[in-house]
Amino acid sequence: MRTENTATLNLIWGALILEELARLGVQHVCMAPGSRSTPLTLAAAQQTKLQRHLHFDERGLGFMALGLAKASRAPVAIITTSGTAVANLYPAIVEAWLTHVPLIVLSGDRPPELLGCGANQAIVQPGIFANYATQVNLPTPDAHIAPQALLTTVDEAVANQTRPVHINCMYREPLYPSELSGVILDTESPYLKPLQTWLQLARPYTQYGKCKQLSSPSDDAIMRFVHGKGVIVVGTLTPEQDPQQLIALSQKIGWPLLTDAQSQLRQHPAAIGNIDQLLQHPRARNLLQEADRVLVFGGRLLSKRVIGYLAEQNWHSYWQVLPEQDRLDPSHNAKHIWHANAEQFAALNWYRSSSANWANTLITYNDELHNLFVRNIDQGEFGEAQVIRAIANTRPLEQQLFIGNSLPVRLYDMYAPVSCCTATTYTNRGASGIDGLLATACGIAAHKGKATSLIIGDLSQLHDLNSLAIAKGLTSPLVIVILNNDGGNIFNLLPVPNEQVRSDYYRLSHGLEFGYAAAMFNLPYNQVDNLADFQDSYNEALDFQGASIIEVNVSQNQASDQIAALNLWVKQS
């Protein structure tokens, strides 16, 4: 391929970047239309190693990429044009950075001479994501810059990266080649002559090795640590960390396993899942206050009561295990932080505690709460908690569950039922925003091809209405369960000093339903007001090969009134 003209060299650079990313483990590329990113777009269109996903809204596109990366546990590339298109990725990049999800942004940009002079669609893109991405600024393609310099730059930026990378790609016009035929990375090209060996192989140009040594305590340290009354608290764990190993660890030491909604163990029968509620139970709380040792796996705990318990307790020893170099200790109590995966740490040489089974009575208290929830939620008034418990009990091994922020994830954390197994569970709890939740769930569903359920509030769904266009293109089941309580009713749980202020400035009632939105995107839709109809609609949707919507309409105060009543019963237990 001849390389004299700018459009051709632009295209070659785009193809080199995409080819190297594929060799570095990228499986998916998410693309939004735009002119300045044309060299990347045309290269991606011919790249057979990547699955392409297209969407017109960059904010939703970024969250879809986040979901794909969460599900695949591999980096995902995103291609956007210049200007505010890049800025629209910011919320997804923030979430990805905080939760160690590798996204690679490839942003088309104007050349240097068109920046800061009033040229159209030109903003300062380098550093646009501030502290939330590793930044790489590529020059405009130049035949005097060796192609291997481009490859080594990409390799250094992406290799072993567990967080977002922003590669800003400047291109001069013309952007469109006169024709698009043949192989872009032509072995006969004089410009590519230094890459002849690389072109014939399938590995990255530069391979970075990483000798990761497990950060682990000594046998003596373990023996001293378990010599007392302790608890194991499990926060956010990704599915591949094999949290089942923590069940065995709990049983070996003889300490109770207290599990968060994001632990992949919230519903496990061997875990104490109702910890948020047990901390309101007088006898259970008194018992838990006897603990003087704690082993915390993961971070970003959901329950304020659990966070408060960890902060207020006078711990003799506080160990935390994190898979990455992170600071996830808002109570500032952790005395030892070990960097290891949960299953690696659980496989160490642990000893039976001298106070094994000291808190076995928690099982009885946990069972009391289970019976209370069956009577007052499952057999009570139709509402949000009842729907969430029904979803959590339905075919968990066959599906994966994405739980939306605000009220849904808290209801799941407080009231999820004990089950023989738990669906693989996902959340966006890095920055805990209510934007992009549907798009993230679409990305998860698109990668796995497995039935996926999304539990989402009405305001969250309104935030991400555009992403119904992504959902429309899915070929695997995605059940979008919208809990419509007409506004931000999590604020019913917060001490807003005046009911009128709560209504006018926090709850923001809208009076909207989602039937017309479903019709606009040609998605199956059901509206239900009782458990039997919900269960029928839900089972039907799990078997539908595509996305569908179930809208659950409840009164504004239903969930908050039920929570208040249940809290009162628990406190009087």
Curated annotation (Swiss-Prot):
Q: What name does the UniProt record give this protein?
A: 2-succinyl-5-enolpyruvyl-6-hydroxy-3-cyclohexene-1-carboxylate synthase
> Can you tell which superkingdom this protein's organism belongs to?
Bacteria
Q: What molecular function terms (GO) are annotated for this protein?
A: 2-succinyl-5-enolpyruvyl-6-hydroxy-3-cyclohexene-1-carboxylic-acid synthase activity; magnesium ion binding; manganese ion binding; thiamine pyrophosphate binding
Q: Which reaction does it catalyse?
A: isochorismate + 2-oxoglutarate + H(+) = 5-enolpyruvoyl-6-hydroxy-2-succinyl-cyclohex-3-ene-1-carboxylate + CO2
The first-level EC class reads: transferase
Q: Which organism is it from?
A: Shewanella baltica (strain OS195)
Q: Which HAMAP family match?
A: MenD (MF_01659)
**Which InterPro entries does this entry report, sorted A to Z?**
DHS-like_NAD/FAD-binding_dom, MenaQ_synth_MenD, MenD_middle, THDP-binding, Thiamin_PyroP_enz_TPP-bd_dom, TPP_enzyme_TPP-bd
Subunit structure and binding partners: Homodimer.
UniProt lists the family membership as follows: Belongs to the TPP enzyme family. MenD subfamily.
A Pfam family recorded for this sequence: TPP_enzyme_M_2
Q: What pathway, per the record?
A: Quinol/quinone metabolism; 1,4-dihydroxy-2-naphthoate biosynthesis; 1,4-dihydroxy-2-naphthoate from chorismate: step 2/7; Quinol/quinone metabolism; menaquinone biosynthesis
Q: So which cofactors does this thing need?
A: Mg(2+); Mn(2+); thiamine diphosphate
Q: Which free-text remark accompanies the cofactor?
A: Binds 1 thiamine pyrophosphate per subunit.
**Role, per record:** Catalyzes the thiamine diphosphate-dependent decarboxylation of 2-oxoglutarate and the subsequent addition of the resulting succinic semialdehyde-thiamine pyrophosphate anion to isochorismate to yield 2-succinyl-5-enolpyruvyl-6-hydroxy-3-cyclohexene-1-carboxylate (SEPHCHC).
Keyword check for Metal-binding, yes or no: yes
Q: Which gene name belongs to this protein? A: menD
Q: What is the lineage of its organism?
A: Bacteria, Pseudomonadati, Pseudomonadota, Gammaproteobacteria, Alteromonadales
Which EC numbers does the record give? Answer: 2.2.1.9
One GO BP on record is: menaquinone biosynthetic process
Q: Which UniProt keywords apply?
A: Magnesium, Manganese, Menaquinone biosynthesis, Metal-binding, Thiamine pyrophosphate, Transferase
